[in-house]
Amino acid sequence: MKNIALIFISLLIITGCSSESDLEKYKEHVITLSSDEFEGRAPGTPGGVKTKNYIADHFGSLGLESFGDSYLMPVNLTGVTLDVDQSIFDLSVNGEIIDIVYRTDVVYGTTRQVESVNFTDSDLVFVGYGVNAPEYGWNDYKVDVKGKTVVMLINDPGFELRGTDFKGKAMTYYGRWTYKFEEAARQGAAGVLIIHETAPASYPWGVVENGWSGEQLNLTFAEKNLDRSALEGWITLDVAEKLFAEMGTTYEEMKAKALSKDFQAIPMEGMKLSSSMVNTLKVSDSHNVAGYVKGSETPDEYVLIMAHWDHMGVDPTRDGDQIYNGAVDNATGTAA
């Protein structure tokens, strides 16, 4: 690119595949990064270090310039690991705690970077898609949910409506779980439970189960993320169907109600959540890897091309193969 600077952020390796030779190089990078040698590429592990060095070495071979004396840019991370055996997730219906199994029926934790989080008797409220999108004239939060636990659908209404609302089947940011947790926190919710459904999520429950159990890494925040909801989690479609049946309705009926701009959040009468979470915190340092090609005409302008290099590492509790190799997520993006 002649007129602007092109920047490659680590999250990545970029070579392009404009020829058969480039395609072979791309495939080689994918195979290498997703091999057992890289141990699942988890930050703060030997496999993560090997991954960063691999990317930096390749940037050097391409002749990319660096920001400073290294392609490595430090990032401080905090890992939060839920002690499941010491933690409590009590979902009750009319005073009776229902049987819910961690990982099989629910995954949960906290984004707050603290050793313990507790709340009791938080009323459940179904908030449709959990979306507040003024540009689409859409607001699922027309009631006060402060201190309550909001239950919501994955994706955004466009996935089902397929019309002009949102972007049809293509997910907007409003459909992502990251947004849903952020918006629930802005609304003051104590807890957030996303209902998993494979088609609108675009991945099966196993992805949620594996991704949300074990250590959860985030940037280290001075305020310890205390502005986030106390509990963030997912429940299976089967659990949601049972809860809605207790309300005398069905999942499909509730979803149909949520597909209207006039939707009003629905209290899930008699249903409450109490939780006590015990966490182990681990602070570690990792790096982004960044290099750039300076433009000849406007060298102070940049085009960013990014991909995350990390994956889920190794799970020693698993039987058999314990390495999450992460070819699709995200060796393919890193090698692109």
Regions found by a protein language model. Give the residues of each.
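Glycine-rich, acidic and aromatic/proline-enriched surface loops and short helix-turn segments
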Residues: 23-35, 147-156, 294-296, 306-314
